Amino acid sequence: MEPKTKKQRSLYIPYAGPVLLEFPLLNKGSAFSMEERRNFNLLGLLPEVVETIEEQAERAWIQYQGFKTEIDKHIYLRNIQDTNETLFYRLVNNHLDEMMPVIYTPTVGAACERFSEIYRRSRGVFISYQNRHNMDDILQNVPNHNIKVIVVTDGERILGLGDQGIGGMGIPIGKLSLYTACGGISPAYTLPVVLDVGTNNQQLLNDPLYMGWRNPRITDDEYYEFVDEFIQAVKQRWPDVLLQFEDFAQKNAMPLLNRYRNEICSFNDDIQGTAAVTVGTLIAASRAAGGQLSEKKIVFLGAGSAGCGIAEMIISQTQREGLSEEAARQKVFMVDRFGLLTDKMPNLLPFQTKLVQKRENLSDWDTDSDVLSLLDVVRNVKPDILIGVSGQTGLFTEEIIREMHKHCPRPIVMPLSNPTSRVEATPQDIIAWTEGNALVATGSPFNPVVWKDKIYPIAQCNNAFIFPGIGLGVIASGASRITDEMLMSASETLAQYSPLVLNGEGLVLPELKDIQKVSRAIAFAVGKMAQQQGVAVKTSAEALQQAIDDNFWQAEYRDYRRTSI
């Protein structure tokens, strides 16, 4: 007889009766068998019929369809998550196309704005500046001893919505839901955290329902000392955890990443995850057009930490394809609200300084303006790729897109700002303005575009294609750090799964139904690169794949056996 795998073995638990029914990680609801109902003091606490998880999921799907607004659907799904996590993930995986935009972007933005209004039940950890001296006690209050992934935010720059205070907790909750749904990381291993350092959002401060610390945000040394206390407490409690920074303001995001990426296994998804999925998309789009990314000229609208992170990763990729660093940098043009970044521009942020163009090289440009606008840049650079990370709607105007198309027969246009209300241009407009010739990928989900009786699928440049696989790869390999090369390997693997590259048609990114397969492949590539980089113990390829399989959690009920506490 073959020995049982870990997933086939019974789970021994000490909880029973109503306490067990109130434990989301263990609750099965109507799926508890009659034997389990007897053994765990559940007789009479549930209806008579014993259901399968699929029968439960079908009922939940019918109930879900009864809600008319996206925010009501979000609230309903969160209620299931807080009641029965296994059922929640079975339901979400059964309807991922429909539900991913509801549990994460764009609907999670509204959920963050209304967090205190729709609050039902606590999930995760809320660490207030007022409680900074109790940091160790707070983390010891977390009942899960084997936390492997933490997503933390301070709520200051939530999507394109700005300061949402503790309402930003919706982002770590949603992000970790995707780690599980897409990357197979057990929900028992995940922990959402919000650092409550106050808020400068006057609307929240005036809201009688607001549940956070009613105080202006702490800044400077006080802020960084508080974050450091948190990091040190995390290292003490879970020294091998993967820590993801999420939706920190531009002024803090890069400094925190640079400060801690070599101290704790950590990364910033807004900077590195967005960069990795964007580069993967661009590699695939370039190959589909029969070329390489290094042959393309690229213009960015938005030169914050996310935009500059993408630009630096593009430069690294084009160097891998054979360009010198100088040549690679000359092909990338960054535009912010003050115009094109040049070496003559004052008050540049540290991460912007290497991405400037030399003003002396622009003397022959067709413009009379000292401030070089996006239109000026597009007209003179004649780019192949236009990327929007501005967080401002409508900035890719018809004039700009038509000017780009005039010089590029197959432009790649990527309005990546989210939520949907912040997108630089809609796919419908971009397709129309380029006579159906643009390849479009967006940051938020959009339906296929119908233009002149032809259907154009719109790929969502969704970080969920990257970060779950990175997380799984880190856990499976035991990586102690996340290196740039590990991120590049994730991008390259994502590009290999592009239907447009594989089949010559379809989306430039894989379909959501394939996301678990893609996450497993990315996990293997990331784990292998971690071993090559010396941040994980070397094993055979077979052993790494086995570790990935062993760590991949499925939304299925296990048999329970009773044990004492």
Swiss-Prot record:
Enzyme Commission identifier(s): 1.1.1.38
Pfam families: malic, Malic_M
Cofactor, how bound (note): Divalent metal cations. Prefers magnesium or manganese.
Binding site for NAD(+): 157, 270, 418
Obligatory cofactor(s): Mg(2+); Mn(2+)
Chemical reaction(s) catalysed: (S)-malate + NAD(+) = pyruvate + CO2 + NADH; oxaloacetate + H(+) = pyruvate + CO2
Residues at the catalytic site: 104, 175
Signal sequence interval, chain numbering: none
HAMAP family referenced in this protein's UniProt entry, alphabetically: NAD_malic_enz (MF_01619)
Annotated protein name in UniProt: NAD-dependent malic enzyme
